[in-house]
Amino acid sequence: MSDSHHTPEAASASLRHVRAKGEPRFPDGPKADPAGSHFERRIRSFQPRRSRVTAGQADALQRLWPLWGLDIDGRRVVDLAELFGNARPVVLEIGFGMGETTARMAAADPDTNILAADVHTPGQGNLLGLAERQELPNIRVANGDAIILLREMLAPGSLAGLRVYFPDPWPKKRHHKRRLIQPEFLTLAATRLAPGAVVHCATDWEPYAEQMLDVLTAHPDFENTVPGGGFAPRPEHRPLTRFEGQGLDKGHVVNDLLFRRVQHKEPPPNG
């Protein structure tokens, strides 16, 4: 989560080589593509941008990445219990901006592990620094495309939740196909979410909110947690961001969506 929409810069596949103005590089996953190669080509979990890395962020990346970082390379299935050092539930957050809200949520719920994925190098360094200063052992930072992370590196049913806060709305009609929350993405995410896991999305772009509501409502693997359907009130566990507060002061509407992964009933045996 950030103070603006998530349009992260593509970072180096290895953060030991931190570049303030490096060329964008994207991790190449295996050729096998059960979710469909067309889906991956037109939808990524990020939009590249360039930003400067401060000395403090670079220091955090150099020191802490070997301890709390995960490169999304598509080469292995991650043992989440080994990654976090415990078997507590893991929530995947896609796009976290500078990480302030991620840190606040981790501090408020120490019994839940947060795997925060982004490619914005300054944000990665900032979140690692926050985790160290605030002593938050339940945060791990993943560098790369969350689509590859979901498809190639997370085991089926391994996630207790998914958070997508203020993703790029791609407001132009011809770019709507690039929005993250689409049926194909939800189908992929559903395979990695345990039954009962909650997908929590938030956006201040009303047309995107309506699209999110439509595709989540129509998807057979999810059900709205709001009685009667519709948008959810902002839950107390999601802090108000600075960006969000500024938008609310200007009369902007922020919509939250909370959908639960459905437990499908097994068909009765024949006979």
From Swiss-Prot:
One of its GO terms (cellular component) is tRNA methyltransferase complex. Residues 1-52 are annotated as: Disordered. It comes from the Bacteria. Keywords: Methyltransferase, S-adenosyl-L-methionine, Transferase, tRNA processing. It catalyses: guanosine(46) in tRNA + S-adenosyl-L-methionine = N(7)-methylguanosine(46) in tRNA + S-adenosyl-L-homocysteine. This is tRNA (guanine-N(7)-)-methyltransferase. The active site is at 168. GO terms for molecular function: tRNA (guanine(46)-N7)-methyltransferase activity. Disulfide bonds: none annotated. The keyword tRNA processing applies. Residues 20-31 have a biased composition (Basic and acidic residues). Transmembrane segments: none annotated. Catalyzes the formation of N(7)-methylguanine at position 46 (m7G46) in tRNA. It is an enzyme of class 2 (transferase). Pfam families: Methyltransf_4. Its EC number is 2.1.1.33. Belongs to the class I-like SAM-binding methyltransferase superfamily. TrmB family. GO terms for biological process: RNA (guanine-N7)-methylation; tRNA methylation. Pathway: tRNA modification; N(7)-methylguanine-tRNA biosynthesis. Substrate binds at residues 172, 204, 241-244.
